[in-house]
Every structure is written in C-alpha cells, then in structure tokens.
C-alpha cells in the first residue's frame, strides 16, 4: 500500500451516475390519451408518468407510476373515434377525473422528487412517438399557466427510434414483443399500461447499450 493511499479507498464505479448519464436529464416515460390528434384543439383525457431509476449496479429500471384521468378542458373537442380506440368512458362513475391543473400537480410532484433524488437538472420526456405526448403536455401546461413543469420543453427520447435501431420494430406492441416483453392488446391504449410497457422497453434498450465512460 502506498503511504498516501486511503486505507478505506473504494474502486471507482464502472458506470456514470444518473446525474451524468444523460447530461443531467432524468428520463421520465410519459403517455397521454387524448380526444384527437391536435393538441391545440383536442382534450387531454389521461396522463401517466414513470421515472426511470438506476440500481447500485448502474442498471435502469422503471420507477413508480403516477397517473391521472382528466376532465376535458373547456372549449376543447373530443373526436368520438378516439374514444372508440382508447375505450375511455368519460362519465364512468369510477373515473375520478381531475381538473388539468390538479392532474399536472399530481403527476409532476413525483417527477420533481425523482429529479432531485438523482441530482439531475430536469426531466426529459421518453415516449413512443414522444413529441405527440410532449405537445399535449406542453399545451396543457400553457392552458393552466403551470409554473413548475419539470420537463425539457422540446427535447425527448423517442422509443420509436430506439426500438427501430435495436429491434427493427417501430410499433410499440411489436417492439415490446421483440424485446421479450409481454404484451396484452386488451390493456393497450391505456395511459398507465402504455407508459409502463414503454418504460420497460426503454430500460431493456438502455441496459443493453454501453454507457459513456
């Protein structure tokens, strides 16, 4: 042992901490279900968020899911065809929908906590066709004048691109199956289910990719 070497010196970890792995951004998977395709015209109806966590070996895993059903914002439209696809029943007695501001507060709080936990600067949205989700999220933030949006305003990680490179698949169901994940078509088009499956897909790809040193 060298004279100046600390007795209890530990080897440096072979992976970057979360705060440095993605340039200070914490990946957070988001999925929204909506009343159509136009974020300035159609209502936001469901949202779910899953922060990506890191274990002591530097491997990624999905964190806890935060989700909310939303009361359609006044003046926005809902295309009946969208409800047919999602299966959302707006007047269901157990929907327990929140106003937009309350719903955003509900899902943003654990995201901010995860950003703080890992010493990151802010969250970066991960999604399948991620800009669709980000545009609806940003539109809702603007409508209610939310001042504590933890997400980067325009940058995303899109699992369409990642899965296309990793597995040659761009449809979420096919990409998940190519990654060896289970897929239940009956549960698809729920914000919670799609978010959790996208989070598993992102972790599977990210864990297979050697991080920077």
UniProtKB/Swiss-Prot annotation:
Residues that bind Mg(2+) 2: 31, 33, 189, 194
SUPFAM superfamilies listed in its UniProt record: Ribonuclease H-like
E.C. no: 3.1.13.-
Gene3D superfamilies the record matches: Ribonuclease H-like superfamily/Ribonuclease H
Molecular function terms from GO: 3'-5' exonuclease activity; magnesium ion binding; nucleic acid binding; RNA exonuclease activity, producing 5'-phosphomonoesters
Cofactor, how bound (note): Binds two Mg(2+) per subunit. The active form of the enzyme binds two Mg(2+) ions in its active site. The first Mg(2+) forms only one salt bridge with the protein.
Residues of the active site: 189
InterPro entries: Exonuclease_RNaseT/DNA_pol3 (IPR013520), RNase_T (IPR005987), RNaseH-like_sf (IPR012337), RNaseH_sf (IPR036397)
BP-aspect Gene Ontology terms: DNA replication proofreading; tRNA processing
Cofactors required: Mg(2+)
Role noted for this protein: Trims short 3' overhangs of a variety of RNA species, leaving a one or two nucleotide 3' overhang. Responsible for the end-turnover of tRNA: specifically removes the terminal AMP residue from uncharged tRNA (tRNA-C-C-A). Also appears to be involved in tRNA biosynthesis.
Self-association and partners: Homodimer.
Family: Belongs to the RNase T family.
This protein's name: Ribonuclease T
Source lineage: Bacteria, Pseudomonadati, Pseudomonadota, Gammaproteobacteria, Lysobacterales
The encoding gene: rnt
């Amino acid at each position: 042992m060298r004279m100046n070497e600390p007795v209890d010196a530990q080897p440096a970890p072979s992976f970057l901490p979360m705060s440095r792995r993605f340039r200070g951004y914490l990946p957070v998977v988001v999925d929204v279900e909506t009343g159509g395709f136009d974020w300035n015209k159609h209502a936001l109806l469901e949202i779910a968020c899953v922060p990506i966590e890191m274990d002591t070996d530097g491997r990624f895993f999905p964190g806890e899911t935060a989700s909310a059903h939303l009361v359609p914002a006044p003046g926005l439209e809902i295309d009946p065809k969208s409800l047919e696809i999602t299966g959302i029943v707006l007047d269901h007695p157990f929907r327990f929908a929140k106003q937009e501001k309350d719903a955003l507060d509900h899902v943003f709080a654990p995201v901010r906590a995860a950003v703080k936990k890992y010493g990151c600067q802010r969250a970066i949205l991960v999604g399948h066709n991620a800009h669709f989700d980000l545009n609806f999220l940003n539109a809702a933030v603007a409508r209610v004048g939310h001042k504590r949006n933890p997400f980067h305003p325009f940058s995303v990680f899109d699992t369409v691109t990642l899965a296309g490179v990793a597995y040659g698949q761009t449809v979420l169901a096919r990409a998940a199956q190519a990654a060896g994940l289970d897929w239940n078509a009956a549960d698809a088009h729920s914000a919670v289910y799609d978010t959790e499956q996208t989070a598993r897909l992102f972790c599977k790809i990210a864990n297979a990719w050697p991080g920077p040193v």
